[in-house]
């Protein structure tokens, strides 16, 4: 069956042919998740300490690129967000640079671990917060509206790129070993706003949109 042979793509589906006849392949539109995933995978080519952790959200967070390129440094712990964060803290304590990629609404499950296992110990863990902000199409359970509150912790910067250019600029900086301690980057589901793509910043200049 198509869903059994390709469970990732059938995790969440729109309308499709019930007979299983595949539609003509169409190149998927770019998204924040895929822009993140490609940038992270490219960084993994040169930094062998870089690893990615998710909780049953490989395709949703764009980690299929990293998992294919660096399978030995990709970890899917299943639906266990608390364990994902504690596992990341352990890897960081041994010199690795773990990137925890979880939807905003599910990352709140690991609030205690973020504080006690990562931040209080000042471990080098990067949190990639997908589905941040209002999330269309996924229903009430997937709204990412609380992470600005529970990630606002002492010594933990939060980056929120408004377009792909900003994401590609800031992510390598967050992955630099010159940064110390936990840090987070949050981005919405789907694609960038055309207005923000036009007026977004390069990291050196900031524009105010009204």
State each model region's role.
Residues 1-182, 191-193, 203-205:
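Thiamine diphosphate
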Residues 187-192, 198:
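Membrane-interfacial segments at transmembrane helix termini in multi-pass membrane proteins
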């Amino acid at each position: 069956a198509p869903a059994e042979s390709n469970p990732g793509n059938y995790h969440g589906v729109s309308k499709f042919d019930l007979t299983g006849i595949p539609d003509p392949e169409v190149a998927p539109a770019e998204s924040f998740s895929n822009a993140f995933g490609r940038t992270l995978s490219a960084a993994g080519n040169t930094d062998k300490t870089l690893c990615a952790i998710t909780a049953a959200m490989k395709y949703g967070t764009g980690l299929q690129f990293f998992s294919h390129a660096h399978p030995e440094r990709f970890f899917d712990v299943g639906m266990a967000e608390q364990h994902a964060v504690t596992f990341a803290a352990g890897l960081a304590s041994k010199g690795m640079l773990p990137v925890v990629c979880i939807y905003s609404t599910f990352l709140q499950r690991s609030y205690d671990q973020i504080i006690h296992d990562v931040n209080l110990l000042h471990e080098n863990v990067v949190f990639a917060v997908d589905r941040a902000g209002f999330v269309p199409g996924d229903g009430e359970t997937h709204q990412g509206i609380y992470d600005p509150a529970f990630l606002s912790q002492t010594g933990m910067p939060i980056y929120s790129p408004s377009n792909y250019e900003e994401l590609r600029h800031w992510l390598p900086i967050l992955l630099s070993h010159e940064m110390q301690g936990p840090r987070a980057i949050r981005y919405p589901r789907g694609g960038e706003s055309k207005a923000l793509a036009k007026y977004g910043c390069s990291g050196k200049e900031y524009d105010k949109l009204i």
